[in-house]
């Protein structure tokens, strides 16, 4: 019985010292969102209020536009209209 209590105590202690934050190297946080497809059509400029670029860890680059209604739309960063919207949002 003493052996079981000792082993259980050691397991609890070991679990207490293990931290999920230590399981991955610093700076290796997974991306919060990635795009796997792009919108097929140009968004009306007056619908777009903000944007962000996806992480370089994603399989393909993308610009994510936030609309007035709170939707997020993935767009191809090589498209001319996407670059124009990004520049416009940066200036404002």
From Swiss-Prot:
GO terms for cellular component: extracellular space. Its main location: secreted. Detected in peripheral blood mononuclear cells and lymph nodes. Transmembrane segments: none annotated. Residues 1-23 form the signal peptide. Disulfide bonds join 34-58, 35-74. GO terms for biological process: antimicrobial humoral immune response mediated by antimicrobial peptide; chemokine-mediated signaling pathway; eosinophil chemotaxis; inflammatory response; positive regulation of cell migration. One of its GO terms (molecular function) is chemokine activity. Induction: Up-regulated in SIV or SHIV infected monkeys with decreased CD4+ T-cell count. Keywords: Chemotaxis, Cytokine, Disulfide bond, Inflammatory response, Secreted, Signal. Belongs to the intercrine beta (chemokine CC) family. PANTHER family: C-C MOTIF CHEMOKINE 4-RELATED, SMALL INDUCIBLE CYTOKINE A. Monokine with inflammatory and chemokinetic properties. This is C-C motif chemokine 4.
């Amino acid at each position: 019985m003493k052996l079981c209590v000792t082993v259980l105590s050691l397991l609890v202690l070991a679990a207490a010292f293990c931290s999920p934050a230590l399981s991955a190297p610093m700076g290796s946080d997974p991306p919060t969102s990635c795009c796997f497809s792009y919108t097929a059509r140009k968004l009306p400029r007056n619908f777009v209020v903000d944007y962000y670029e996806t992480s370089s860890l994603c399989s393909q680059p993308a610009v994510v536009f936030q609309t007035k209604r709170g939707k997020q739309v993935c767009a191809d960063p090589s498209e001319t209209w996407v670059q124009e919207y990004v520049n416009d949002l940066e200036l404002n």
